Amino acid sequence: MAPNTSRKQKIAKTFTVDVSSPTENGVFDPASYAKYLIDHIKVEGAVGNLGNAVTVTEDGTVVTVVSTAKFSGKYLKYLTKKYLKKNQLRDWIRFVSTKTNEYRLAFYQVTPEEDEEEDEE
């Protein structure tokens, strides 16, 4: 029997991150986030080796990552958390999955706590 010579075509995975909420408040810069992803994504074990395998585009309040190489949503979440920590935004903004391969940055829900001192007085 002859060996199968047909190769599988690489399927492009698309990940979208909606950064509209923190961008509207002026605490988040989508352009610097996209640049951070470009500078830190590893392809085949090397940083800065994107080539044609991974493309990162920033379109207003949406950052899109298209990959034909091995890339996961968990890795995108890891890099985003690292970016938020570096810019001291990790305490206020979180990375939330909305659908498969669709994410958004959202502020933590803060519930006002009543001071016990005011109740006692």
Swiss-Prot record:
Keywords of the record: Cytoplasm, Ribonucleoprotein, Ribosomal protein
Gene Ontology MF: a single term: structural constituent of ribosome
Gene Ontology CC entries for this record: cytosol; cytosolic large ribosomal subunit
InterPro entries: Ribosomal_eL22, Ribosomal_eL22_sf
GO biological process: cytoplasmic translation
Localization (cell): Cytoplasm
Task performed by this protein: Component of the ribosome, a large ribonucleoprotein complex responsible for the synthesis of proteins in the cell. The small ribosomal subunit (SSU) binds messenger RNAs (mRNAs) and translates the encoded message by selecting cognate aminoacyl-transfer RNA (tRNA) molecules. The large subunit (LSU) contains the ribosomal catalytic site termed the peptidyl transferase center (PTC), which catalyzes the formation of peptide bonds, thereby polymerizing the amino acids delivered by tRNAs into a polypeptide chain.
Family that this chain belongs to: Belongs to the eukaryotic ribosomal protein eL22 family.
More details: Present with 60400 molecules/cell in log phase SD medium. There are 2 genes for eL22 in yeast.
Subunit architecture: Component of the large ribosomal subunit (LSU). Mature yeast ribosomes consist of a small (40S) and a large (60S) subunit. The 40S small subunit contains 1 molecule of ribosomal RNA (18S rRNA) and 33 different proteins (encoded by 57 genes). The large 60S subunit contains 3 rRNA molecules (25S, 5.8S and 5S rRNA) and 46 different proteins (encoded by 81 genes).
The protein's name in its UniProt record: Large ribosomal subunit protein eL22A
Biological classification of the source: Eukaryota, Fungi, Dikarya, Ascomycota, Saccharomycotina
Gene that this sequence comes from: RPL22A
